[in-house]
């Protein structure tokens, strides 16, 4: 019975995925993923990126966000990206493969950032979902807390933080914490984010 349910669920997901207009557009444009469009929508509304910026990209693979951001920051900008999964090279992106939760990986990431502060920390990290909110939400909240901690360590005053969060237990407390650290905080649900998904994007600007 369980196998049939998983098979049906997987079939629905695949059908939805390959008929998704943003997936089709991404394939047509040669983009790494549909996530490119989510960040584009956020940039249109919140103007996070400017030429010459330094950015940290967490949960970067397969590279949709980094691929978009390099078009906004130009040749003088720099992106330090990290993911557990491999990612094909992108010009202007310094990629570190490893588990962000591992202290050695975190140390290596901070070494790549160096002494200079960054202007944007962005996180599209998500755990491997099992479909049970009581398990998935705490796993997700742990990752977004780590991303926020990273932003505290490396963001310059006035810097920005954008993070994918799955709504559920702990969301309001997390949002409150971010509001204490940034001058302006918005919760975005891009059109390119699937309607039935719990995901939203917190966009925080003006690091205090």
Swiss-Prot record:
Keywords: Cytoplasm, Methyltransferase, rRNA processing, S-adenosyl-L-methionine, Transferase
CDD domains per UniProt: AdoMet_MTases
GO cellular component: cytoplasm
Presence of the UniProt keyword Transferase in the record: yes
Enzyme nomenclature, EC number: 2.1.1.166
Predominant location: cytoplasm
SUPFAM superfamilies tied to this protein: S-adenosyl-L-methionine-dependent methyltransferases (SSF53335)
Keyword Cytoplasm on entry: yes
InterPro entries named among the record's database cross-references: RNA_methyltr_RlmE, RNA_MeTrfase_FtsJ_dom, rRNA-MeTfrase_E, rRNA_MeTrfase_gammaproteobac, SAM-dependent_MTases_sf
List of residues binding S-adenosyl-L-methionine: 63, 65, 83, 99, 124
Localization of this protein: Cytoplasm
Pfam families reported for this sequence: FtsJ (PF01728)
Active site (record annotation): 164 (proton acceptor)
Domain of life: Bacteria
GO-annotated molecular function: rRNA (uridine-2'-O-)-methyltransferase activity
Known catalytic reactions: uridine(2552) in 23S rRNA + S-adenosyl-L-methionine = 2'-O-methyluridine(2552) in 23S rRNA + S-adenosyl-L-homocysteine + H(+)
NCBIfam families cross-referenced by the UniProt entry: PRK11188.1 (NF008390), rrmJ (TIGR00438)
PANTHER family referenced in this protein's UniProt entry, alphabetically: RIBOSOMAL RNA METHYLTRANSFERASE (PTHR10920), RRNA METHYLTRANSFERASE 2, MITOCHONDRIAL (PTHR10920:SF18)
HAMAP family attached to this UniProt entry: RNA_methyltr_E
Function: Specifically methylates the uridine in position 2552 of 23S rRNA at the 2'-O position of the ribose in the fully assembled 50S ribosomal subunit.
Family: Belongs to the class I-like SAM-binding methyltransferase superfamily. RNA methyltransferase RlmE family.
The protein's name in its UniProt record: Ribosomal RNA large subunit methyltransferase E
Lineage: Bacteria, Pseudomonadati, Pseudomonadota, Gammaproteobacteria, Enterobacterales
